[in-house]
């Protein structure tokens, strides 16, 4: 076969592959928008009170944090919170650049995260979705958005354990919309010392974060003290650092997050460091 014909065949195959990958990503995007419409359309807006006088039992470092984060604001309109993020994911199978986004309910532990993992910084290798809607979960990851390598498939006990972690995960990101950390039927605060407190899940959900505050009254770390069920049936302990606080629409929030997960032997399993590019309330 002539070289020119061989090149045409190769070019044709590459074109088909690129089209198939594009179709896969578009299909996933459409699925994600349908899920977002299903779980994050709040309907009529309502106002959330930020009056700390309603919470006389807040531990001292927690109260100081809210005073810092709220900057004197007394209320906020409840809307879904959207943000874009970009970072690096270090997995046991390799290192990836991630472009991600998340939408969260403003006052309930519901969120939808989606992201594309790039190999070498340019090849869209993996597409992932993680949706938690309080007592349900829709998670999957696909190579080139076609070949599933992770899905929601747990026995009832493991699923319950996973939901405990996913609820905490929501609150670990809620430092970007701090009114969601006020006490309610889903969680409460318990004192530890002058610089730390526990954020404790309530009701059917079980688990807690040890939360550390700095001298500027910022939350700088939220960590689980024990391993918890994560995606892909892994038991891991999470340490999440919150950095680079900025004033966003009148609230002080961190714009860099650094997560590290450890296995039962306390060996580092995974890292995800990312910067928040945009937050919309």
Task: Describe the function of each predicted region.
Residues 139-202, 207, 232-233:
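Flexible, processing/modification-adjacent segments and terminal tails
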């Amino acid at each position: 076969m002539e070289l020119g014909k061989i090149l045409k065949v190769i070019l044709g195959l590459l074109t088909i592959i690129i089209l198939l990958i594009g179709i896969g990503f578009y299909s996933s995007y459409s699925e994600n928008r349908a899920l977002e419409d299903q779980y994050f359309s709040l309907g009529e807006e309502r106002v959330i009170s930020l009056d700390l006088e309603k919470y006389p039992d807040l531990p001292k470092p927690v109260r100081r944090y809210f005073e810092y984060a709220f900057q004197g604001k007394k209320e906020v309109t409840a809307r879904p919170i959207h943000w874009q993020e970009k970072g690096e994911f270090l997995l046991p199978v390799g290192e990836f650049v991630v472009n991600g986004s998340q939408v969260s309910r403003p006052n309930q532990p519901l969120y939808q995260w989606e992201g594309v993992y790039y190999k070498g910084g340019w090849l869209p290798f993996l597409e992932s979705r993680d949706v938690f809607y309080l007592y349900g979960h829709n998670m999957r990851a696909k190579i080139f958005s076609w070949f599933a390598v992770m899905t929601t498939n747990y026995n009832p006990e493991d699923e319950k354990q996973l939901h405990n972690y996913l609820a905490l995960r929501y609150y670990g990101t809620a430092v970007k919309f701090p009114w969601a950390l006020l006490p309610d039927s889903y969680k409460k605060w318990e004192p530890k010392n002058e610089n730390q407190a526990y954020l404790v899940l309530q009701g059917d959900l079980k688990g807690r974060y040890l939360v550390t505050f700095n001298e500027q009254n910022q939350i700088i770390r939220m960590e689980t003290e024990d391993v918890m069920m994560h995606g892909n049936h892994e038991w891991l302990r999470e340490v999440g650092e919150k950095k680079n606080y900025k004033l966003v629409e009148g609230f002080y929030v961190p714009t860099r997050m650094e997560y590290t997960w450890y296995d039962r032997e306390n060996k580092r399993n995974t890292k995800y460091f990312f910067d928040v590019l945009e937050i919309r309330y």
